[in-house]
Amino acid sequence: MKNKTALISVYRKEGVVDFARAISDMGWNLISTGGTSRELKSAGLEVKDVSEVTGHPECFDGRVKTLHPAIHSGLLSRRANKDDQETLNELGYQTIDLVCVNLYPFEETAAIEPPVDDPTLIEMIDIGGPTMIRSAAKNHDDVIVVTSPNQYDEVLAALSKAKGEPTKIDPELRKKLALEAFQATSAYAVSYTHLRAHETREY
């Protein structure tokens, strides 16, 4: 019975099939969303849709997919905390041991010439992705957070060395990945605020 779970939900899909296949081969369950789920399934991987985990369909054109206690309880519950684990079991939720997420390309979309209309740009504001990233990064003692395809090889090498066991990953690597995760979400927020601040000054 597989007991390690990765949630994979990426906008930039280069390398994601190979990454997912490698961790699946190490005995991991895969959870995914939308287009990522379709990509992985089309490659022959066994994937559970996030709606099967939450018991709630993706809605509002994908605006709400992972914003659910079933996801964030799995990310934020402390494995060594008995009360956390008892509560998780009472709620019927499962731990999530790795999150692989990269974000909608807001900054790249904002730079398109001629400019896209505001409704199009607004749909490039990622909400669920940064939220998952920050939850995983906060609980990096227990959760591996992957925010860029450039990290895939390093994470796979570490997992291979640990024989697929997330708890045996070097704590310093966990800290580094968490730092890079917070840097990614911070830069993402700054790109939005800079754009809107510039627009506001024009009025």
Indicate where each model-derived feature is located:
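Conserved small/polar residues in nucleotide/adenosyl-binding loops
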Residues: 193-202
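General beta-strand structural signal in soluble alpha/beta enzymes
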Residues: 8, 29-34, 49-52, 77, ...
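Short coil/turn connectors at secondary-structure junctions
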Residues: 2-5, 26-28, 43-46, 69-72, ...
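N-terminal glycine-/serine-/threonine-rich phosphate-binding loop
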Residues: 1-32, 36-49
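Short acidic-hydrophobic catalytic motif
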Residues: 181
